[in-house]
């Protein structure tokens, strides 16, 4: 993929777009790993267990997707960048992948890409996470 980036930017963009789509579709089947404390408080008010909800379920409890955001803690863009840097680490990259629910207002505080330390990003944004037991 690195060679492709250097040789043909258009081809690289097509590959990156395809990988992004594949990873996001894969995520649709993955269990929710974390929920922010604030998202849990909001979900408790409407009697929803966010650990049981996937992106496809969101409109059932959040009409218009206005309150909650399904967050990729290890962003898809960062995953692809890491795959590009070290193609041998793809297995490790997928093992480190985490998704969870936060509030839209919390999402606005997060750096969208190039998160060097994903845990530190949440601490800096003052977003406390509850992990699946």
Where are the regions that the model predicts?
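Amphipathic alpha-helical interface segments
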Residues: 1-64
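Domain-level detector for secreted/extracellular nuclease and nuclease-toxin modules, and
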Residues: 2-17, 77-80, 92-93, 110-115
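Amphipathic alpha-helical interaction segments
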Residues: 34, 80-82, 130
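Histidine-centered nuclease catalytic patch
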Residues: 60-93
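Catalytic cores of phosphodiester-bond-cleaving enzymes
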Residues: 93-96, 100-133
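Hydrophobic transmembrane signal anchors and adjacent membrane-proximal interface regions, especially
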Residues: 48, 53, 70, 90-92, ...
